[in-house]
Amino acid sequence: MANLGCWMLVLFVATWSDLGLCKKRPKPGGWNTGGSRYPGQGSPGGNRYPPQGGGGWGQPHGGGWGQPHGGGWGQPHGGGWGQPHGGGWGQGGGTHSQWNKPSKPKTNMKHMAGAAAAGAVVGGLGGYMLGSAMSRPIIHFGSDYEDRYYRENMHRYPNQVYYRPMDQYSSQNNFVHDCVNITIKQHTVTTTTKGENFTETDVKMMERVVEQMCITQYERESQAYYQRGSSMVLFSSPPVILLISFLIFLIVG
């Protein structure tokens, strides 16, 4: 880890040093230099933007003031104010006009709330969070009747589980046990309120289904917890702290 931080430090120092040298180089095209910054101006260094069809002042086909085919004020074919063929203010011919454009659609707050629901703390449940939706697992219960009953009624069972952060439990079994109990309780109360009741067979199958989903949720939380711990170790190492301090010094300076 220390070697990785040192190599990253060397790489960023070399990169920022090269950028610093580039910033100090003089830019061409300024005042009293060879390159011209404006079209139509003769200079020893050449013209970076050659005139299109005689673009100087007062030319018969240029874009100057009051010319027959130019884009100045009040010309019939120019791009000035209120002209019938121009791309000026409020005209139909201007493909890049910023006026009269439809406003951008606003973000639907319901969609934002739905996207933030997974993993969010559920109010009124004492710190429980609602996991993301899962596919209901394929489970065999040991008899053709129960297997068929499960396939026909699996849509009535939960596809999300309630859980607390894994660091509040001493083992996976405790996490899964609590997850199963709170999930079945909440789902049963919600469904019963809608007028639907569960039989003993339903409860038995829900316990198996929710148990598998809670195990999956525990594995996801374990992986995320490990990744967060690895990130904290990486950013707390002395080489990385030195690198971040050096980058802040370069940006501020």
From Swiss-Prot:
Gene3D superfamilies listed in its UniProt record: Prion/Doppel protein, beta-ribbon domain
Family as reported in the entry's similarity comment: Belongs to the prion family.
Primary site of residence: membrane
Disease linked to the protein: PrP is found in high quantity in the brain of humans and animals infected with the degenerative neurological diseases kuru, Creutzfeldt-Jakob disease (CJD), Gerstmann-Straussler syndrome (GSS), scrapie, bovine spongiform encephalopathy (BSE), transmissible mink encephalopathy (TME), etc.
Protein name: Major prion protein
Annotated glycosylation sites: N181, N197
Bias kind Gly residues: ranges: 52-95
Function according to Swiss-Prot or TrEMBL: Its primary physiological function is unclear. Has cytoprotective activity against internal or environmental stresses. May play a role in neuronal development and synaptic plasticity. May be required for neuronal myelin sheath maintenance. May play a role in iron uptake and iron homeostasis. Soluble oligomers are toxic to cultured neuroblastoma cells and induce apoptosis (in vitro). Association with GPC1 (via its heparan sulfate chains) targets PRNP to lipid rafts. Also provides Cu(2+) or Zn(2+) for the ascorbate-mediated GPC1 deaminase degradation of its heparan sulfate side chains.
Disulfide bonds: C179-C214
Binding site for Cu(2+) 3: H77, G78, G79
Subunit structure of this chain's protein: Monomer and homodimer. Has a tendency to aggregate into amyloid fibrils containing a cross-beta spine, formed by a steric zipper of superposed beta-strands. Soluble oligomers may represent an intermediate stage on the path to fibril formation. Copper binding may promote oligomerization. Interacts with GRB2, APP, ERI3/PRNPIP and SYN1. Mislocalized cytosolically exposed PrP interacts with MGRN1; this interaction alters MGRN1 subcellular location and causes lysosomal enlargement. Interacts with KIAA1191.
SUPFAM superfamilies: Prion-like (SSF54098)
Maturation-removed propeptide residues: 231-253
Keyword Transferase: no
PROSITE patterns cross-referenced by the UniProt entry: PRION_1, PRION_2
Region (Interaction with GRB2, ERI3 and SYN1): 23-230
